[in-house]
Design a protein with these regions (language model features):
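Basic, amphipathic alpha-helical/coil surface patches used to engage anionic, phosphate-bearing ligands
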Residues: 2-459
Length: 459
């Protein structure tokens, strides 16, 4: 399915059920992960931090207010969340990222990359299943065993010696890794904006800026982990530095007995916030935990769900897209390669357009269109005092109305290892969902303990 560049296989023949707003037990406004700290769900201090951040960036020539603004609020908020709302720290990371993007022509890389180079990267690294979790966040799967030392060596060799795009480089970022960042561009510029425009989610007025990830390490031996150490460390550190807060949770499946040794390396590649999002699940934890976050119809069969999806193939179209997406040119699913959304019909709809190059020919073909629902005409108002207490409440309804599905509430007393990783014995009696909920509440308490001066800027 993914080996050719023709339109993806057609969507499931099953009839589409009505779009409903589905709430998971771990995605309420009382918890730190989502949507707290996102557009429409900011406390007074967080609102002030965002305004101060915009002022600092504008004063230092890295931001223009527009309209349209040079950078949207949801992007700026990613850097603020990553740096715990300390504006000057967020500025330094933002500036480093902007400098890195300019020095490596990341926009040009994404728009001009050769399809075969893109496809080689796509097949090796985290892949969008075409589905979302219960909150509307895209679900990615990553099977580590595909990254053996021979494959990585060849991947880096071709990347360093081939002209796979029109982008320049800074000579510092390993050329063999640059293709990987076309995939991050696809996440932030295609998948997340697409999921933002889909209304069948719990908070349709909140733009999607994260991803949920299943990382499958079954069948990976200690030698393979060791051989991958350098490559994975470089890739992880660059991604953490320049694509902050694009991960919601990472569920590690199939961990071998020696994984605690491997974890000792891995946790040093990430900042503490990212580390806190990683959960290691034993075999009996996988199905109940994933189902708490993801509808079974969107979980691959390999992990106890109903989705006929195999790592390596293109994303499986969701029946809920029927009646929302208008496919064109014979397409019934999204093809491989760079994709971007562009406004059409006087801003009433958005169109998916292909980019990249096939041979010497640049691609530019319209795949589909769908209604533009975000940004909504009326943004939700939020009680800032309640947000600060972790109980945000909308006071104005959005333009989108959907059917509510009742929400479960659970509590539990967690155990945790000193190193912060959530492992089998940290999730007691198979009650992974309760453990995750308590983890979120603990995270929220830590965030609230930050000094009130966190929004103060440095001139």
């Amino acid at each position: 399915m993914a080996s050719n560049l023709s339109p993806a296989a057609s969507a499931s023949g099953a009839s589409a059920s009505p779009a409903t707003r589905v709430k998971s037990a771990t995605s309420t406004t009382s918890q730190f992960g989502y949507p707290r700290g996102h557009v429409g769900y900011l406390s007074a201090d967080e609102e002030e931090a965002l305004r101060s951040f915009q002022d600092v960036l504008e004063e230092r020539g890295l931001y223009k207010r527009g309209p349209p603004a040079s950078h949207d609020d949801q992007t700026l908020l990613r850097f603020l969340r990553a740096r715990r709302w300390v504006v000057e720290d967020a500025f330094r990371q933002f500036k480093d990222t902007e400098d890195w993007r300019a020095a490596n022509s990341i926009d040009t890389l994404y728009k001009t990359i050769q399809l075969d180079a893109y496809e080689q990267s796509r097949r090796l690294y985290p892949q969008w299943t075409g589905r979302r979790d219960r909150r509307g966040i895209p679900l990615y799967v990553f099977e580590i065993r595909t990254l053996d030392s021979k494959t990585i060596s060849e991947y880096e060799r071709l990347g360093s010696k081939s002209t796979f795009s029109q982008a320049k480089t800074d000579g510092k970022t390993p050329p063999g890794l640059l293709r990987l960042f076309a995939l991050y561009e696809n996440l932030t510029r295609f998948t997340q904006p697409f999921c933002t425009q889909l209304a069948d989610r719990e908070h349709p007025a909140v733009p999607i800026t994260m991803s949920t990830n299943i990382v499958d390490i079954q069948g990976v031996g200690l030698t393979q982990f060791w051989n991958l150490k350098g490559h994975m460390q470089a890739a992880s550190q660059l991604a953490t530095a320049h694509y902050p807060e694009t991960l919601d949770r990472i569920f590690i499946i199939g961990a071998p007995m020696f994984f605690s040794t491997v974890w000792g390396w891995i946790k040093r590649w990430f900042d503490p916030i990212t580390v806190s999002k990683i959960f290691v699940l034993s075999a009996h934890e996988v199905k109940p935990t994933l189902e708490a976050f993801i509808d079974p119809c969107n979980i691959p069969k390999k992990y106890g769900g109903e989705l006929d999806y195999t790592f390596g193939q293109l994303g499986v179209p969701d029946p809920h897209w029927e009646g929302v997406i208008d496919w064109e040119e014979g397409f019934t699913g999204f093809p491989t390669g760079p994709l971007l959304w562009e406004e059409v019909d006087d801003g009433k709809r958005v169109a998916c357009v292909t980019y990249g190059s096939k041979g010497d020919e640049p691609r530019r073909q319209r795949i589909c269109t769908l209604p533009k629902i975000w940004p909504a005409t009326a943004a939700p108002e939020v009680d800032a005092e309640n947000v600060a207490e972790g109980t945000a409440t909308k006071t104005t309804s959005t333009a989108v109305t959907m059917t509510d599905v009742s929400e479960a509430t659970q509590t539990a007393e967690p155990k945790a290892h000193d190193d912060g990783v959530q492992t089998d014995d940290a999730i007691t009696n198979g009650d992974a969902v309760k453990k995750l909920q308590m983890h979120d509440e603990k995270h929220a308490e830590a965030a609230n303990s930050a000094p009130p001066a966190l929004a103060t800027t440095v001139a």
